[in-house]
Design a protein with these regions (language model features):
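Short linear elements at protein peripheries
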Residues: 437-500
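A glycine-rich phosphate-binding loop feature that marks nucleotide/adenosyl-phosphate handling sites
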Residues: 92, 276-289, 323, 334-338, ...
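Short coil/turn segments at secondary-structure boundaries
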Residues: 275-278, 409-415, 448-453
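The feature marks the mature, well-folded catalytic cores of soluble enzymes
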Residues: 1-314
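Ferredoxin-type iron-sulfur electron-transfer modules in oxidoreductases and energy-metabolism complexes
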Residues: 289-318, 328-329, 333-446, 485-486
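Short, contiguous, pocket-lining structural segments
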Residues: 251, 319-323
């Protein structure tokens, strides 16, 4: 499925992420979250939930009859004058694109944002064949200009300041921008955008080939749909004489009615907009009478492991994804460790459930555990992908050894987990444990936080504080109101039992963390 075969070391990769990146990530995703909440509220919650259910139904039905829709799509594209190519895996997809480019003597390529191109590692193959590939998405263009000087975690360029981008443009493009490296205020975004636009327009006009993706493919008409905000995708698709479109087979939509539903959902959750700046419909190459569009259009339909998921309920529900990335924006894990930690082109919750199924659990067995199971991704997903259900399903397979990497679990961990389950399943023990923890935490308490616990918990609090343990809110409320509805306080014997349980759990947890620290657990 991919040239990558080494197991993904999520823990090791995330440990390398600089602390300042997390704050920048949260700030960037919070802005999108606020916009999303506003447009969804304006849509109306009841109507929104109905639209989500409709979107899910469209995606599930499409996947159940995917072969029929793809056959219809191929016939429609061919009838419109386009060429359809089928790629079983990443290697065959790269070969197809290289053969098309070489047959047309291509030396310069302009590329819009395409996760599929990254998935099949196409850019490196094109460069190895002597072709120049220019990223035209503004963020990707900045990252490409910076090259190896940019920390690998800063992808895309959302975490770079305006001043950093201005300095980069001065050095790489040789342009004069008002103000020096220490100028305050930094150059306006419009100034930087105009500089990039000037360079990119010249590249569009000189390019031999445009390389794009597509958000959807309408089977009944053979129409390719591209949803963007920058307009670079439209330029890549209309100015060069040759266009190659890379699309996973799962992005097909049966008809225009289904597309209308999905276009209602996608921009609202992806960018917090009712509709993006550009929605482009591509229907075959240009006719002789048209003044724009490619003279030749090639569509590469890529499987790369997706078809094997169709026979499994969890696989189909995963493939419902319409690639909005809303799950990334709300995920506390992604916002802390960034995308590079996931070790694959698709990070965040969707990467955590898709990579193990596409790449195999032997490669991505760590990713199902890269989640707090908070469920925020479930709530925000426009097509109601059940992330936590799929994550738990994949975790059970890893524990059962289906991926060839069953984790080594020490008896101490088993004992600690068993004791924790007993406490959490008993109201009496839980209340007693909470009261015990509230007392035991006193030496390390600073306000509402535990900022510096002793080993082995010191490893956790060295990175982030823990909230203090408090007794149940309802019990405290009734105590203040002198309400006896909760019954008599715990007996001394029960309190003693609860304290003992709490101490056993704490001891088990400490031993488990100690084992992990020594690399045993």
């Amino acid at each position: 499925v991919s040239t990558m075969r080494e197991p993904i070391d999520f823990r090791g990769r995330s440990a390398e992420v600089p602390a300042e990146m997390s704050a920048a990530m949260r700030q960037a995703t919070a802005r999108t979250g606020r916009s999303r909440a506003e447009v969804v509220a304006a849509f109306g919650n009841e109507r929104w939930q109905a639209q989500r259910r409709a979107g899910q139904a469209i995606r599930m039905d499409t996947l159940l009859h995917l072969d029929q829709h793809l056959t219809t799509l191929e016939a429609a594209i061919s009838a419109a004058g386009g060429h359809v190519h089928w790629a079983a895996d990443a290697e065959s997809a790269r070969t197809i694109v290289l053969e098309i480019a070489q047959a047309h003597g291509v030396t310069s390529i302009v590329k819009s944002k395409s996760w599929t191109a990254k998935e099949i590692e196409l850019e490196a193959a094109l460069r190895a064949a002597g072709m120049n590939v220019l990223e035209t998405d503004l963020g990707d263009y900045i990252v490409q200009l910076a090259g190896p000087r940019l920390p690998k975690h800063i992808v895309p360029a959302a975490q770079l300041t305006r001043q950093c981008i201005a300095d980069l443009f001065r050095q790489e493009l040789g342009v004069a921008i008002a103000g020096g490296p220490a100028a305050d205020p930094a150059p306006e975004p419009q100034t930087l955008t105009l500089i990039a636009r000037e360079r990119l327009r010249a590249a569009f006009l000189a390019a031999d080939m445009g390389l794009t993706g597509a958000n959807f493919m309408v089977a009944e008409s053979g129409t390719l749909v591209m949803v963007t905000n920058e307009g670079n995708g439209r330029m890549c698709a209309t100015v060069p004489p040759l266009q190659v479109v890379l699309v996973p087979i799962t992005k097909v939509v049966p008809d225009w009615a289904g597309l209308a539903v999905l276009l209602d959902l996608l921009p609202r959750v992806a960018t917090g907009q009712k509709m993006t700046s550009y929605v482009q419909f591509m229907h075959g190459p240009r006719a002789n009478t048209d003044g724009y569009g490619p003279r030749e259009l090639h569509v590469v339909l890529i499987d790369n492991g997706r078809s094997k998921l169709l026979g499994d309920e969890m696989g189909r529900r995963t493939l419902c994804c319409i690639r909005c990335e809303a799950c990334l924006h709300v995920c506390p894990v992604y916002n802390t460790v960034g995308g590079d930690s996931y070790g694959w082109v698709q990070p965040g919750p969707i990467g955590a459930i898709l990579a193990p199924q596409v790449l195999g659990l032997n490669v991505a067995h760590a990713l199902p555990f890269a989640s707090t199971l908070c469920g925020a991704c479930n709530d925000v997903c426009p097509v109601m992908v059940p992330f936590t259900e799929v994550l738990l399903n994949l975790r059970s397979k890893v524990v059962a050894g289906d991926g060839g990497n069953p984790p080594a679990v020490s008896p101490v961990v088993v004992a600690g987990a068993t004791m924790a389950a007993a406490v959490l399943s008993s109201p009496v023990l839980y209340r007693g444990a909470a009261q015990a923890a509230a007392v035991l935490q006193t030496p390390w308490r600073k306000g509402d936080w535990l900022a510096a616990l002793p080993p082995p918990m010191a490893r956790w609090t060295a990175v982030r504080p823990l909230p203090v343990v408090s007794t149940a809110f309802r019990r405290a409320w009734h105590a203040r109101a002198k309400d006896s509805s909760l019954g008599a306080p715990l007996s001394r014997a029960r309190r003693g039992l609860a304290w003992a349980a709490a101490l056993l759990v704490a001891g088990g947890l400490a031993a488990w963390l100690g084992h992990r620290r020594r690399g045993v657990g």
